[in-house]
UniProtKB/Swiss-Prot annotation:
Single annotated GO MF: isomerase activity
Keyword Transmembrane included in the entry's annotation: no
Superkingdom: Eukaryota
Lineage: Eukaryota, Viridiplantae, Streptophyta, Embryophyta, Tracheophyta
Protein name per Swiss-Prot or TrEMBL: Tocopherol cyclase, chloroplastic
Amino acid sequence: MNLAVAAALPSVTPRTGVVLPRSSRRHCPRGVVPRAASSSVSSFTSPSAAAAPIYTPTPQDRSLRTPHSGYHFDGTARPFFEGWYFKVSIPECRQSFCFMYSVENPLFRDGMSDLDKLLYRPRFTGVGAQILGADDKYICQFSEKSNNFWGSRHELMLGNTFISNKESTPPQGEVPPQDFSRRVLEGFQVTPIWHQGFIRDDGRSNYVPNVQTARWEYSTRPVYGWGDVKSKQLSTAGWLAAFPFFEPHWQICMASGLSTGWIEWDGERFEFENAPSYSEKNWGGGFPRKWYWIQCNVFPGASGEVSLTAAGGLRKIGLGDTYESPSLIGIHYEGQFFEFVPWTGTVSWDIGLWGLWKMSGENKTHLVEIEATTAESGTALRAPTIEAGLVPACKDTCYGDLRLQLWEKKYDGSKGEMILDATSNMAALEVGGGPWFNGWKGTTVVNEVVNNIVGTPVDVESLLPIPFLKPPGL
């Protein structure tokens, strides 16, 4: 794949991002003064961090709400997991925090009894909370029970109580932050516009650099969902995602947002205002066999808000033993959405064992090329697997160097006007599953019948306007 810069038209000046200097990660840029800590916790404050997070209850009708924002568990005994991912990046100190939550087989809220194992075969159950934070350090807390987990059927709202105040009952829905702090000693709650919690490492992950505790509280203003800002937001995997057809399904819930608040991490307090943020989720009977992933919404110097999400994997389709290797690139820029998916074009990838991610795509109107690298060793993260439960299954870093180039497509298929040429050194990069004996190179090859079905414009939400008729999660 040739990722050299194409010669632009003489009259066109591409919008180019500027890479942040490779300074020490904890080195605060000039003009940033750490605040005095109120206790033994040291403090970092972003240059603009003056505002405190403001809690607002989640409104019923959000303009940027995507399909599949809700919790998809249908109450049946089929194998099931759901996972959520929320990322906040602080460009001023080149640090990111990635919050990951998962629930496995929630039908068995107290774990599986001997009778359950006899009737349904042994399965892994429970709720996990992971954070990949500053300096790629890690924390994880897990419980085999999900009786204190809750999720909204139709909105991006969920929470869990690992340890409650003995004088209070665990919340079973969104509550004001003061109420949460009073009732929950260890746990979390998150909505599209509010996120808070406190977790304690349970000692299961001593194979990576970890921290003992993390506490956070921040509000978020969504900027992009998944689609044009002024249009109805889209299902990432098409309308078939409303049914248990793919294993797993995937949805970007917020391609970009601006978050304000604070995170306490390993004895250091990070305060921020309007920090770039992101959220996505997946659900189904099991994780892909193998996958790769790129996400970045920190592009200094680029005009307007820019967000990139690109990924692919080997996943199961239907009830048989059939697998496909779909791949996707989605770009939000200046309010517009540029989508490269199998049902509208082609996507190619060239992924190394670790350290190199190359992707390109084309649709009827545009061409895109992505190259990302990292010299970091990466951190092993956990994923809910059918075979072993929540175990190390992927490797991530938030210190990827990335270049994103987007062109208009000429009538002959060649590159036309360059729309965007942006760079970053804060890309989140991941490879997972396996085995990864070698690199992985290919072009989207999907089942043609499935491709035609997925590409059919069907608005499932409009077909089922009454909430209780909608499938869970939609």
